[in-house]
């Protein structure tokens, strides 16, 4: 797995990184625990890498962006033409890196591209935190193949 394209400070890859992954369907009671986790990571200045694609991952990104710690967004598609203004501002501060294992012509996110992106994040991260892992879901299968320790929030 390799990074094909990026925007932002590639130097962030040298930092210790925690990958945040979460099944798309998550029990309501675990959502707040994920928010608390994001706030604690922000307060400790930890570098988090995630796809920030699902609803819960976007919420985690929202909490992380309120801090000053480094953030790495891993896309399951090629780089976008235009970024959201809040991401542009963080790129200028040097605290954000957006990476992708895909060329620009890959425009749609599929289960396959998400799996490739998730494998890249797991390869790059020293630590893995899972918000929630659905039984027999894609994330459970993927994480069972990793030899890294996995911290489970819920």
Language-model segment annotations:
Residues 1-154:
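Glycine-biased, small-residue-rich flexible motifs in mid-sequence functional cores and linkers
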């Amino acid at each position: 797995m390799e990074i094909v394209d990026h925007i932002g400070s590639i130097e962030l890859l040298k930092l210790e990184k925690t990958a945040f992954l979460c099944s798309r369907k998550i029990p309501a009671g675990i959502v707040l625990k994920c928010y608390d986790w994001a706030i604690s990571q922000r307060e400790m200045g930890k570098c988090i890498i995630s796809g920030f694609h699902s609803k819960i991952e976007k919420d985690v990104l929202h909490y992380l962006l309120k801090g000053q710690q480094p953030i790495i967004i891993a896309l399951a598609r090629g780089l976008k033409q235009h970024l959201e203004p809040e991401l542009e501002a963080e790129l200028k501060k040097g605290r954000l890196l957006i990476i992708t294992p895909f060329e620009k012509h890959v425009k749609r996110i599929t289960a396959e591209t998400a799996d490739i992106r998730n494998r890249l994040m797991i390869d790059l991260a020293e630590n893995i935190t899972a918000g929630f892992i659905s039984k027999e879901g894609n994330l459970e299968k993927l994480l069972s193949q990793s030899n890294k320790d996995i911290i489970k929030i819920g």
